[in-house]
Amino acid sequence: PKRGRKNRLTHLVYALDVSGSITSYQAQQFLRSAKTLKEKLNPKLMTVMLWDTRIQFEKVFREDETLDNIKVNAGGGTNLQPVYNRVRQINPEALVIFTDLCVDIPPKPTWETIWFVPDPNMYKDQYMNQYLQAVTYGDVYVVPEK
């Protein structure tokens, strides 16, 4: 059997933006990235949330489960506050957010936050750099388009 790492994550929350500004391609790309993240980090628990103005889907996956049968339907507005409210209840070690940042960023939380955003060079929104500057906490990573 595989041995766990000493500093292994016990609970990671992965929040995928499925609002109307997210393209179908981006949503699928974000989901593929979630699968890769789970394989690499292998937390004991990984809560996956799909959200727009509310949490549309939430499921906890154990370390021996794969992220399968998650259907993504993008549409609607964008509000991160319901995600932050729920994450506050869960109290994980980290929150990973995949979003295009077309959202008001809540105040800095107590948990570690990691942002994954589309490549601004490929993104059609002229305000993308402004959105990136709105993120004042956590680490921001760019997801290449291809």
State what each model feature region is.
Residues P1-V13, I22-Y25:
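Acidic, polar low-complexity linker/tail segments
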Residues H11, L45-T47, A94, E112:
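Residues at the starts of beta-strands that form the adenosine-phosphate
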Residues Y14, V48-L50, I97, W115:
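Structural beta-sheet core signal
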Residues D17:
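Residues that scaffold, gate, or flank divalent-cation-dependent active/transport sites
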Residues S21-T23, D104-I105:
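Catalytic P-loop NTPase motifs of RecA-like helicase/translocase cores
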Residues Q28-L50:
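An active-site-proximal "capping" alpha-helix that borders the catalytic cofactor pocket
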Residues Q29, C102-K146:
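VWA/integrin I-like adhesion module and closely mimicked acidic/polar interface patches used
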Residues T47, I55-V60, D64-D104, P120-Q130:
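Von Willebrand factor
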